């Protein structure tokens, strides 16, 4: 008696066996892992700069990664809004700086702005 395939067509037993073995061979191959982006290597580098003898647990790293992602999204969103308000199509360092000033409180904003300015200056001088 002919077998019914997954598509609903009838095929002979010999053809059915061939179809089954082909799908089994495909399953045997290793699938490429889906790459998950994170800031963990950069967080680790900063940790070693600040406290060279201190380690970090995977749970703490996960929390720090979520924190960095959240702050990045907030700054990007605010900078985008500022560019839209001023009828600009480009987010520049000025929009980022203003977004940081709006989002972060007092002294933290001042430090973030000074570090950002320093990083931009270093980048432009190396070009």
Curated annotation (Swiss-Prot):
Monoubiquitination at Lys-36 by the MSL1/MSL2 dimer is required for histone H3 'Lys-4' (H3K4me) and 'Lys-79' (H3K79me) methylation and transcription activation at specific gene loci, such as HOXA9 and MEIS1 loci. Similarly, monoubiquitination of Lys-122 (H2BK120Ub) by the RNF20/40 complex gives a specific tag for epigenetic transcriptional activation and is also prerequisite for histone H3 'Lys-4' and 'Lys-79' methylation. It also functions cooperatively with the FACT dimer to stimulate elongation by RNA polymerase II. Crotonylation (Kcr) is specifically present in male germ cells and marks testis-specific genes in post-meiotic cells, including X-linked genes that escape sex chromosome inactivation in haploid cells. Crotonylation marks active promoters and enhancers and confers resistance to transcriptional repressors. It is also associated with post-meiotically activated genes on autosomes. Residues 1-32 are annotated as: Disordered. It is found in: Nucleus; Chromosome. The modification N6-crotonyllysine is found at residues 7, 13-14, 17-18, 22, 25, 36. Belongs to the histone H2B family. The modification N-acetylproline is found at residue 2. The modification N6,N6,N6-trimethyllysine is found at residue 87. The modification N6-succinyllysine is found at residues 36, 118, 122. It comes from Rattus norvegicus. The modification N6-lactoyllysine is found at residues 7, 13, 17-18, 22, 25, 45, 87, 110, 118, 122. The modification N6,N6-dimethyllysine is found at residue 59. The modification Phosphoserine is found at residue 38. There is a cross-link at residues 36, 122 (Glycyl lysine isopeptide (Lys-Gly) (interchain with G-Cter in ubiquitin)). Variant histone specifically required to direct the transformation of dissociating nucleosomes to protamine in male germ cells. Entirely replaces classical histone H2B prior nucleosome to protamine transition and probably acts as a nucleosome dissociating factor that creates a more dynamic chromatin, facilitating the large-scale exchange of histones. Core component of nucleosome. Nucleosomes wrap and compact DNA into chromatin, limiting DNA accessibility to the cellular machineries which require DNA as a template. SUPFAM superfamilies: Histone-fold. Testis. Expressed in pachytene spermatocytes during meiotic prophase I in the absence of any significant DNA synthesis. Keywords: Acetylation, Chromosome, DNA-binding, Isopeptide bond, Methylation, Nucleosome core, Nucleus, Phosphoprotein, Ubl conjugation. GO terms for cellular component: cell surface; female germ cell nucleus; nucleosome; nucleus. The modification Phosphothreonine is found at residue 117. This is Histone H2B type 1-A.
């Amino acid at each position: 008696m002919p077998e019914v395939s997954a598509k609903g067509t009838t095929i002979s037993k010999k053809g059915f066996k061939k179809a089954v073995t082909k799908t089994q061979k495909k399953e045997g191959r290793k699938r490429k892992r889906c790459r998950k982006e994170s800031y963990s290597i950069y967080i680790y580098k900063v940790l070693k700069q600040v406290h060279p003898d201190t380690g970090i647990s995977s749970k703490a790293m996960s929390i720090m990664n979520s924190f960095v992602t959240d702050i990045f999204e907030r700054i990007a969103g605010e900078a985008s809004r500022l560019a839209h308000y001023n009828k600009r199509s480009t987010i520049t360092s000025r929009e980022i700086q203003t977004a940081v000033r709006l989002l972060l409180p007092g002294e933290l904003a001042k430090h973030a702005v000074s570090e950002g300015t320093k990083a931009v200056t270093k980048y432009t001088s190396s070009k």
